[in-house]
């Protein structure tokens, strides 16, 4: 006997009345207040007595008074008449009392008859109800027995009988709602118990679904195949009937759920073997805790009403939840997906939990909607994972998640916080055009292969602290609206930030770029911090704009470095920076103070046509290769104090608009060049020094004692003589011609 059947019978011991129940007595006891009064008991005697007595009094009393008291004849006749009236009245009253009592008795008898008839009817109704309930229980018992029948048609008939009995109990108006629910739940438990019952052939479903007999198959293939298909139909029928009676909803604009007649029941499919399709159904309170799915698990277009529990469920073959809707919480924690899992275009109205789930093959969540929190913490995706165009309306949790193969978060919308803390991406990862509307945490995340955030948008903070990028990292045209941190991040291969936008602070403190780092045409809206950053190979900041302070303090550039046409709007610091190879600042624009204090340039460095709008300091800088400052413009004070030029120092065509300080500079190999032939124009290109007011500090060309000297000559402008390098000229800072783009008042070359 099934467990559900035993519980059902135990429940009936308290529901069925015992056979010893006393019946309503047939005779009725007359109340004491309705007993016969004395005047009714002696009615005849009283009637005769009053009649005779009144008649005698009417004859004798007037006669006696006439005879002995001298009453007149007329008065005696009048008295006689009065006595007769009184006697008649008494008799009439007595008769009325008797009639009234009789009427009351008739009414009591009628009421008693009516009450007896009602009691008889109630008894008959109770007997009928007991008979109906007994008949239902008898049908229930037979239906439960049918579930164990060998014939599928008989089992199917038992299922339909049980389903009908549930509906009958719910429609039984003789029971209160609690009793209706209790009776129906007993049958529901039996149906769920049948779903949970083992079916050995389910383990052979892969062989039995083949068109031909597998060579290694043990058993009667044809018979087993037929039995499997029959049982699939039988068990699917249970879900069909449940679906018809479950809640309905529409999702045109918003999810509106309308309860069904079975919506208050509890359904338990835990540890059930599922080996049949469940697509196109409504499943309410789906509890598949520890369930095992043999063959493909098909839940396409299924509406899960209220919570759906697949905790530690095991999916042995492909899993299909395509376009399914989960109106309650969806729990797939620690579920095991052995083959492909497809949740494409699914909708999760409440929290979705895939914590520690294991996806052995491809997992597809493309275009799915997670309305509330989505948790994939510590989940494992062994093959490709696809979240393309999915929407996370609340927090997206990928804490310590492992993506062993390619993963696609392209065009995903993260509306709330996103957490990829210590997540591992073993293969390629794409976040192209993804939108992070709240804080995004990639702290200590590992990207083993290529990763792309191309054209992604981070509306709030982005944290990539101590993240590891083993292969190429692409942030091309990525937009960071708030603060972003790559502090101590490691880029082992190329890092591409070309045309990226950092609206707020960008922190690359102690970041390591193992190979090429590219920031071409990147925009830094606030402070950019590259303190102690390490650039392992070529790095490019072509046409990059730093709107606020830029800090490269003690950064290390291992290979060639280019800041070509870069714009530093505020202060920039390259203090103690080491440039190991060729470096270019050609046409760069420094609108704030530029600090190259004790920087080391171990290869050639070029500042050709660069512009320093404010103070520039090269104090103690070391240039081991050639240093080219030709046609550079120094609009404010420039200091090369204690700087060392081990190669050629080219200043031809440079413009020094304020005092130039070369005190204790050291030119170890050759003289500094302040004039040279311009290859393009064929003209001699001379450095220019502003004619400073007399109260200003003069240009200083007193080099270090062991240095090659700067050959000086003299020239004058406006009657003031200056010592400047031979061949260079003085100019009047106020003589700039905007049309000709040159100073018009120049001195003769210094001699």
What are these regions (language model features)?
Residues 19-54:
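Juxtamembrane interface helix immediately N-terminal to a transmembrane segment
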Residues 29-30, 71-171, 175:
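Membrane-proximal alpha-helical anchors
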Residues 37-41, 56-64, 291:
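Feature of secretome-associated and extracellular-like proteins
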Residues 129, 138-145, 151-156, 160-163, ...:
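N-terminal leader/targeting and pre-domain segments
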Residues 2-29:
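Short, charged cytosolic
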């Amino acid at each position: 006997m099934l467990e559900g059947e035993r519980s059902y019978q135990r429940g009936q011991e308290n529901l069925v009345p015992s056979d010893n129940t006393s019946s309503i007595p047939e005779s009725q006891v007359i109340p004491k207040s309705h007993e016969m009064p004395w005047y009714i008991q002696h009615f005849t005697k009283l009637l005769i007595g009053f009649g005779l007595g009144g008649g005698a009094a009417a004859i004798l009393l007037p006669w006696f008074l006439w005879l002995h008291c001298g009453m007149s004849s007329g008065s005696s006749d009048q008295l006689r008449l009065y006595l007769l009236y009184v006697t008649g009245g008494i008799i009439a009253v007595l008769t009325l009392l008797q009639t009234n009592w009789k009427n009351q008795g008739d009414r009591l008898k009628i009421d008693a008859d009516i009450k007896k008839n009602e009691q008889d009817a109630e008894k008959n109704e109770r007997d009928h109800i007991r008979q109906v309930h007994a008949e239902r229980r008898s049908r229930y018992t037979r239906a439960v027995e049918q579930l164990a029948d060998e014939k599928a048609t008989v089992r199917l008939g038992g299922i339909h009988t049980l389903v009908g009995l549930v509906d009958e109990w719910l429609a039984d108006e003789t029971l209160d709602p609690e009793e209706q629910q209790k009776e129906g739940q007993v049958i529901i438990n039996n149906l769920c118990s049948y779903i949970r019952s083992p079916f050995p052939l389910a383990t052979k479903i892969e062989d039995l679904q083949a068109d031909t007999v597998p060579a290694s198959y043990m058993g009667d293939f044809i018979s087993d195949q037929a039995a499997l298909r029959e049982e699939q139909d039988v068990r699917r029928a249970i879900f069909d009937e449940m679906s018809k009676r479950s809640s309905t909803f529409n999702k045109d604009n918003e999810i509106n759920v309308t309860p069904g007649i079975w919506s208050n029941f509890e359904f338990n499919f835990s540890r059930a073997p599922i080996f049949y399709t469940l697509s196109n159904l409504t499943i309410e309170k789906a509890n598949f805790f520890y369930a095992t799915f043999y063959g493909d698990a098909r839940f396409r277009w299924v509406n899960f009403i209220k919570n759906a529990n697949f905790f530690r469920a095991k999916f042995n073959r492909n899993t299909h939840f395509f376009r399914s809707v989960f109106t309650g919480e969806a729990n797939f924690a620690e579920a095991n997906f052995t083959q492909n899992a497809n949740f494409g275009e699914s909708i999760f109205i409440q929290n979705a939990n895939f914590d520690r789930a294991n996806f052995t093959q491809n997992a597809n969540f493309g275009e799915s909607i997670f309305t509330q929190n989505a948790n994939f913490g510590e989940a494992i995706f062994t093959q490709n994972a696809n979240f393309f165009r999915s929407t996370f309306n609340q927090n997206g949790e990928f804490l310590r998640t492992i993506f062993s193969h390619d993963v696609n978060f392209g065009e995903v919308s993260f509306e709330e916080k996103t957490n990829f803390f210590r997540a591992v991406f073993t293969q390629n990862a794409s976040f192209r055009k993804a939108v992070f509307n709240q804080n995004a945490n990639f702290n200590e995340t590992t990207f083993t292969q290529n990763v792309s955030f191309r054209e992604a948008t981070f509306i709030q903070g982005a944290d990539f602290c101590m993240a590891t990028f083993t292969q190429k990292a692409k942030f091309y045209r990525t937009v960071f609206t708030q603060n972003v941190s790559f502090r101590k991040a490691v880029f082992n291969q190329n890092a591409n930030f070309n045309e990226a936008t950092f609206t707020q602070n960008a922190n690359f403190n102690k970041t390591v770029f193992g190979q090429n780092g590219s920031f071409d045409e990147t925009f830094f809206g606030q402070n950019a911090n590259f303190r102690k950053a390490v650039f392992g190979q070529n790095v490019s900041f072509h046409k990059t704009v730093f709107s606020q302070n830029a800090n490269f303090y003690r950064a290390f550039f291992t290979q060639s470095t280019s800041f070509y046409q870069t714009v530093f709007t505020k202060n920039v610091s390259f203090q103690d920076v080491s440039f190991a190879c060729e470096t270019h600042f050609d046409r760069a624009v420094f609108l704030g103070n530029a600090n190259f204090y004790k920087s080391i340039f171990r290869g050639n460095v070029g500042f050709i046509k660069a512009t320093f709008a404010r103070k520039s300091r090269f104090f103690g800088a070391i240039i081991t290769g050639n240093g080219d400052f030709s046609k550079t413009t120094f609009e404010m004070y420039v200091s090369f104090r204690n700087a060392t030029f081990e190669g050629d120092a080219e200043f031809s065509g440079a413009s020094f608009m304020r005092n130039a300080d070369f005190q204790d500079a050291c030119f170890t190999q050759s003289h500094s060049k302040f004039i040279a032939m311009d290859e393009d124009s064929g003209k001699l290109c001379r450095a220019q020094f502003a004619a400073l007011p007399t109260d200003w500090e003069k240009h200083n060309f007193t080099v270090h004692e062991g240095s090659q000297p700067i050959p000086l000559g003299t020239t004058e402008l406006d009657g003031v003589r200056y010592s400047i390098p031979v061949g260079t000229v003085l100019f009047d800072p106020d003589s700039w011609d905007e049309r000709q783009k040159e100073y018009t008042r120049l001195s003769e070359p210094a001699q």
